[in-house]
Amino acid sequence: MSTKDFIEKDYYKVLGVPKDATEAEIKKAYRKLAREFHPDANKGNAKAEERFKEISEANDILGDTKKRKEYDEARTLFGNGGFRPGPGAQGGSFNFDLGDLFGGGAQQGGGAGGGFGGGIGDVFGGLFNRGGAGPGTGTRTQPRRGQDIESEVTLSFTEAVDGATVPLRMSSQAPCKACSGTGDANGTPRVCPTCVGTGQVARGSGGGFSLTDPCPDCKGRGLIAENPCEICKGSGRAKSSRTMQVRIPAGVSDSQRIRLRGKGAPGERGGPAGDLYVVVHVDAHPVFGRKGDNLTVTVPVTFAEAALGGEVKVPTLGGPAVTLKLPPGTPNGRTMRARGKGAVRKDGTRGDLLVTVEVTVPKDVSGKARDALEAYREATAGEDPRAELFQAAKGA
């Protein structure tokens, strides 16, 4: 990406969020758009794939507090076509320390080229040159970090609670195997004469500064392939697919995003690999539910068990049943707790199993059961469970 594109691209607009959006709002917007335009959900749709890349790029900047700050400050300074010196500024003089802004000191070399180190340099790729220096100044193209990759995986309810190792197939740009990443079929590219191997050319912007863009002749690589590789068309990068075993930790929740450092696309020119982000989807369970670190289950009990009390066996997820004691007069909907039978927490301990009692009413009653219920009704004929209800209704 050119520095001009970086400054002029409105990442807030890409994600559809305001400039004062919170981290949570940015994350929510990104997840919604990423799911909508993910390549797996839009196979063969080139526009959706390009949109997904744009969304991921915006999230990479706005989702990182430091990068977002640098991006906002750079847009403020250069969003209107470049920095304009204040009254009294002459030539290449500059009375504002950009090094303070970008996390590195400004290097001055009498207008013969230079730059800013650290901080935003990783994002801008050497944004500034002093004094409008021409092509060939600066350092040779630096190693470039590989792209981040996002993938999705669907787990069963039990796998999400206990953790699982799953195969994950990913596609990304990697050094072309046919030409060993050189872009040249013979493996011997030559140094680009336009940028003298830097991969960048300078253009004036006024105020004694010049901005750098990727060299149009070598596409920012610093090298030109005399004999372009047929596989990568001289770019040195080709699409590569690989399958790796990914360990999903215990206790993950639905829609959780897991970051695996260094497992993304390989870097360029010896640069580090990007990161892999795995979005986890969890299937529903026919019996158990989940509330945070706790699991939930509804257990039916008879009228007699609820009224008289007793012991009830309760199933657990992947383990032996536990026995809970019902106190006499247990109402329908009461929730009890089986400690340590829930989901795994980050510290390795487990949450609880929340057991909700559901008093069942038989549809067909006959024989001794009917006689017993008739006797119970006669014995409690003087009791009115709705008396307090009507009393409260009158007093309201």
Curated annotation (Swiss-Prot):
Where Zn(2+) 1 is bound, by residue? Answer: 176, 179, 229, 232
Q: Where in the cell is it found?
A: Cytoplasm
SUPFAM superfamilies cross-referenced by the UniProt entry = Chaperone J-domain, DnaJ/Hsp40 cysteine-rich domain, HSP40/DnaJ peptide-binding domain
The record, for InterPro entries, names: DnaJ, DnaJ_C, DnaJ_domain, DnaJ_domain_CS, HSP40/DnaJ_pept-bd, HSP_DnaJ_Cys-rich_dom, HSP_DnaJ_Cys-rich_dom_sf, J_dom_sf
**Biased composition regions of type Gly residues, renumbered to the chain:** 127-137
Q: Which parts of the chain are CXXCXGXG motif repeats?
A: 176-183, 192-199, 215-222, 229-236
Cofactor(s) it depends on: Zn(2+)
Keywords per UniProt: Chaperone, Cytoplasm, DNA replication, Metal-binding, Repeat, Stress response, Zinc, Zinc-finger
| GO cellular component term of the entry, any | cytoplasm
ZnF (CR-type) intervals:
163-241
GO MF annotations for this entry? ATP binding; heat shock protein binding; unfolded protein binding; zinc ion binding
Co-factor remark: Binds 2 Zn(2+) ions per monomer.
**Could you say which residues bind Zn(2+) 2 here?**
192, 195, 215, 218
**Region annotation Disordered: where it falls in the sequence:** 127-149
Please provide the Gene Ontology terms (biological process) for this protein: chaperone cofactor-dependent protein refolding; DNA replication; protein refolding; response to heat
Q: Which domain of life is it from?
A: Bacteria
Q: What is known of its domains?
A: The J domain is necessary and sufficient to stimulate DnaK ATPase activity. Zinc center 1 plays an important role in the autonomous, DnaK-independent chaperone activity of DnaJ. Zinc center 2 is essential for interaction with DnaK and for DnaJ activity.
Q: What does this protein do?
A: Participates actively in the response to hyperosmotic and heat shock by preventing the aggregation of stress-denatured proteins and by disaggregating proteins, also in an autonomous, DnaK-independent fashion. Unfolded proteins bind initially to DnaJ; upon interaction with the DnaJ-bound protein, DnaK hydrolyzes its bound ATP, resulting in the formation of a stable complex. GrpE releases ADP from DnaK; ATP binding to DnaK triggers the release of the substrate protein, thus completing the reaction cycle.
HAMAP family attached here?
A: DnaJ
Self-association or partners: how does it assemble?
Homodimer.
What is the similarity comment for this entry?
Answer: Belongs to the DnaJ family.
Tell me the protein's name.
Chaperone protein DnaJ 1
Q: Whose protein is this, by species?
A: Streptomyces avermitilis (strain ATCC 31267 / DSM 46492 / JCM 5070 / NBRC 14893 / NCIMB 12804 / NRRL 8165 / MA-4680)
Name of the gene this protein is made from: dnaJ1
